[in-house]
């Protein structure tokens, strides 16, 4: 019975799931917006939000905890140098999930997951 067992299995064993969420978390931190399936996005939120909360207090212990969870030096550097200070005044809710239709091959629901308050990319607009 699965009473009180939280989290989604996503048809993967535990090591595959852990590796997948490490990769997705690193991608989200580096790109600040990624497109994935809706269940993965909802589960990724449970991984990334505590990492950003950890990054709000810059200490060696917190950096080591973040590295243990992501296994990526660049991700840890961006978390503590950029994202921690950016979200210092926000008390949670660092990510936003936007549904974006269904995948062509298998009709899986897709979604964008992004960090809120991310800097807008200046689009090349030509004024005539």
Swiss-Prot record:
GO terms for molecular function: structural constituent of ribosome. It holds the Pfam family Ribosomal_L17. Keywords: Ribonucleoprotein, Ribosomal protein. One of its GO terms (biological process) is translation. Disulfide bonds: none annotated. It comes from the Bacteria. One of its GO terms (cellular component) is cytosolic large ribosomal subunit. InterPro entries: Ribosomal_bL17, Ribosomal_bL17_CS, Ribosomal_bL17_sf. Belongs to the bacterial ribosomal protein bL17 family. Part of the 50S ribosomal subunit. Contacts protein L32. This is Large ribosomal subunit protein bL17. It comes from Haemophilus influenzae (strain ATCC 51907 / DSM 11121 / KW20 / Rd).
